[in-house]
Regions:
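Extracytoplasmic electron-transfer domains, predominantly the class I c-type cytochrome c fold
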Residues: 30-31, 38-41, 93-97, 123-124, ...
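Generic anion/oxyanion-binding catalytic loop in active/binding sites
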Residues: 86-87, 111, 178-181
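Secretory-pathway/luminal and periplasmic proteins that interact with or process carbohydrate-rich
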Residues: 108-111, 131-135, 202
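Local sequence-structure signature of Cys/Sec-based thiol-disulfide redox active-site neighborhoods
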Residues: 110-121
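Positively charged n-region of N-terminal signal peptides that target proteins for export
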Residues: 1-7
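Post-cleavage N-terminal segment of exported redox proteins
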Residues: 3, 14, 19-108, 162, ...
């Protein structure tokens, strides 16, 4: 009787574990890609190839929450190698132009004019100045960014780099890779860097 009970228990546990394995098995990437790509089509400058993931995106998809430290370090190292600083060595532009870029959410959508420069839409995620009360909180407040950190060459380089490719500093961050993905030009990134660091900028008042 005992043997029959144990055998029955084993069958039940095996069946349960099999169901759990099936339920936990993720959809094959190819199946997901087929469904996603079937749901989109090219419209203007918004192309379906935006669904193609690079190594950084694949790793962030594979480890969406608690990722191993080694994976996070790998992602940051990959993106640090992709960093491009201005050839002229100048990292600061005009903060007034930077404010315009931070306020603008135009760009890269199918309905946008591709000949117009894109904006950074920085206020959608960050507080920057005291005057602008419409801001998001997905990202940290950047108010007094330069006032708190100073305006050294190292800080300028970090700030420019963070805007150009934030994945080099924080693996799987929500912040877009503005320079790496050609959302903003080098000149625009200089302007936004100045917005954050110039002592005359409203960010630092």
């Amino acid at each position: 009787m005992k043997n029959i009970y144990l055998a029955s228990l084993c069958v039940v546990l095996f069946a349960a574990s099999s169901q759990m394995c099936v339920a936990a098995e993720p959809a094959k990437p190819t199946q997901v890609e087929i469904v996603m790509k079937a749901s989109f089509k090219d419209r203007g400058q918004a192309k379906v190839d935006r669904l193609n993931q690079d190594e950084t995106q694949r790793l962030c998809t594979q480890y969406p929450d608690k990722r191993p430290k080694a994976i996070a370090s790998k992602i940051e190292a990959i993106n640090m190698k992709l960093m491009k600083y201005p050839a002229d060595g100048k990292l600061l532009g005009d903060w007034k132009e930077g404010e315009k870029i931070a306020q603008s959410g135009v760009g890269k959508q199918f309905s946008d004019d591709p000949t117009r420069p894109a904006g950074g839409n920085c206020y959608a995620c960050h507080q920057l100045s005291k005057e602008e009360i419409a801001f998001g909180n997905i990202g940290p407040s950047l108010y007094h960014f330069g006032k708190l950190r100073g305006n050294t060459e190292a800080i300028q380089k970090y700030t420019f780099g963070k805007i150009y490719n934030a994945q080099a500093y924080a693996a799987c961050t929500n912040m877009p890779r503005f320079g790496h993905n050609s959302i903003l030009t080098e000149e625009q990134i200089k302007h936004v860097t100045a917005l954050l660091l110039d002592p005359n900028s409203p960010v630092n008042k």
